Amino acid sequence: MSGSYTPSPGGPFSALTASMWPQDILAKYTQKEQTVEQPEFRYDEFGFRVDKEDGAEPNSSKLLGIPLTEDPQQRLRWQAHLEFTHNHDVGDLTWDKIDVTLPHSDKLRSLVLAGIPHSMRPQLWMRLSGALQKKQNSEMTYKDIGRNSSNDDTLAAKQIEKDLLRTMPSNACFSNLQSVGVPRLRRVLRGLAWLFPDIGYCQGTGMVAACLLLFLEEEDAFWMMATIVEDLVPVSYFNTTLVGVQTDQRVLRHLIVQYLPRLDKLLQEHDIELSLITLHWFLTAFASVVHIKLLLRIWDFFFYQGSLVLFQTTLGMLKMKEEELIQSENSASIFNTLSDIPSQIEEADVLLREAMLISGTLTEVMIEAQRRKHLAYLIADQGQLLNSTAAVANLSKIMRRQSQRRKSAITTLLFGDDNFEALKSKNIKQTALVADLREAILQVARHFQYTDPKNCSIDLTPDYTMESHQRDHENYVSCSQSRRRRAKALLDFERHDDDELGFRKNDIITIISQKDEHCWVGELNGLRGWFPAKFVDILDERSKEYSVAGDDSVTEGITDLIRGTLSPSIKSIFEHGLKKPSLLGGPCHPWLFIEEAASREVERDFDSVYSRLVLCKTYRLDEDGKVLTPEELLYRGVQSVNVSHDAAHAQMDVKLRSLISIGLNEQVLHLWLEVLCSSLPTVEKWYQPWSFLRSPGWVQIKCELRVLSKFAFSLSPDWELPVKREDKEKKPLKEGVQDMLVKHHLFSWDIDG
């Protein structure tokens, strides 16, 4: 009987692919029409049961009241575009003559935003998403996958069986076990669970697959699902941890702060966890929350643009309801309004227009940068890095079941064997590197506590919470409440008169007055007096309090700990997964990566109308009163080391150790690591996918390094450089102040400042 009954245009089931027409129900419709009786149930063009007539009442839904129609002009525009871009052959243009992928262009984007003609959706969705190319390039056919996944005894198969009738119970194609769509949905979901064993079965995929089966043939629907899992959404979106979609909820929250600040303030005031509502929107790509007509328009753009559309659509929805949310009286009202937003959106054009207005400038690069950061934070927050470093490798790529075709010996020799055991050994190496770094940090911390007892109260436990990362920049911005300006004595100065301030080498003097260029007034041990300015060195205490334990000119042991223990452990982490040079040779050192990443990060501000030191970036001030971001500080540090060390022909190892010393002095070593790891193009260029810097593991290293920011270092970046000849020939310091001493006897000194 298949194909015997055809739905009437615009009538029930008319929008479905032909093979999904439920012949038993269509047969009843035909019989009812002949007997002039009302059918038992009414169905819309998508096969969903309609309980009552809709469209006549003033408050009726536009989506239900207006049938799905195809705009002839829009179809002509699509045909013209396809003919113009694929007019390689003379004659009628058919789908087999159109490329498997459609090159992105402004024209194509505008066409997609305006909507794809419904009759063209199956072919265009496959091409826009890349599913057709995936289908044609696959080593295994859908039949092979179906044959391998037909086992009823697997855990995934049993879970799928439980959910088959729960997925879309109000649709005639999935309402009972005899419905035409149920066996198709079973095979598609089993095939996905078999092809992606790391994911298995996720309930979120069921709703998406069922919607696709309404409009695409079974095999095409399967490859569309494979494309969504592998290409359109991030890794781990559908696995048991849902860490991918959880990460996107944090990214969404970040975007709301940027694009909808009033709504952000409202959510914070009422302590509403938005992800409780929106996670399901993302997991099902809106399939479970919006009307099918609206879903088709969202999916048109989703298959063209990818997961970026999920963010833009959500922001558009929230913007449309922002005023209503702000006027809500309490938390319960806000939560309910947020939950009801998707079901209240009725006009796709209005939604997409609002989405483009508020977030049209949002790009995939911006989203990926935030994803990388928040994924690392999320995993560190959950403690997974401490317990299972193997989980990190699984987040970099979805493992697809492959056909059993072995690599040749030459291929293995040239490109290596990235099997599970190899990844496992790399994860073991990661654990050892973290342990070495942690021990080096503890050695430095114990040195501070032993040498300078005031450090004994410092907590040495790393803080892995999400809040700790938010506080990092706040701590960086805020300077010490103590506004004292202090200096360290470079040599002994004996007191002869009552108005002189005597001190010994390395004493810490509080400066009272610097009015005179040569003679300053200071205080030490309750006594005030003048002293030669050249006899002291101003301490950098913008955000720290000087400690003798961290001064390499006073305490020799700190040099060995920093340059001999800590720096090598940090270098080992930067060397982990560093890509080796080609067979032709070439340098391969973390310093080269740091140089390039620092330059790339700071270049983003070069084209600004203002200087890259503009005050709108309210970070710490340097000695010239300019404002420096962590990126700028890193860039300056790298340039400073290059200038001083290149003149001495120093090796890159020495440069790296000196830069680490600068980072410790400025208490920004952990922030510099974040800057470097956030430079995605540079990291991907220099490091393997399994490396520490390309995995979420870097955030644990950041948390470990943050412990060092609790201590005050005064390290010389030039410690390993040879002493310059002019420095050797310089006159003793005391000889340089004879004129100043004469000046002391000629003038009176205002000791009280």
Curated annotation (Swiss-Prot):
Keywords: SH3 domain. Belongs to the small G protein signaling modulator family. It comes from Xenopus laevis (African clawed frog). It holds the Pfam family SH3_1. This is Small G protein signaling modulator 3 homolog. GO terms for molecular function: GTPase activator activity; small GTPase binding. SUPFAM superfamilies: RUN domain-like (SSF140741), SH3-domain (SSF50044), Ypt/Rab-GAP domain of gyp1p (SSF47923). Residues 557-720 form the RUN domain. Residues 482-541 form the SH3 domain. SMART domains: RUN, SH3, TBC. It comes from the Eukaryota.
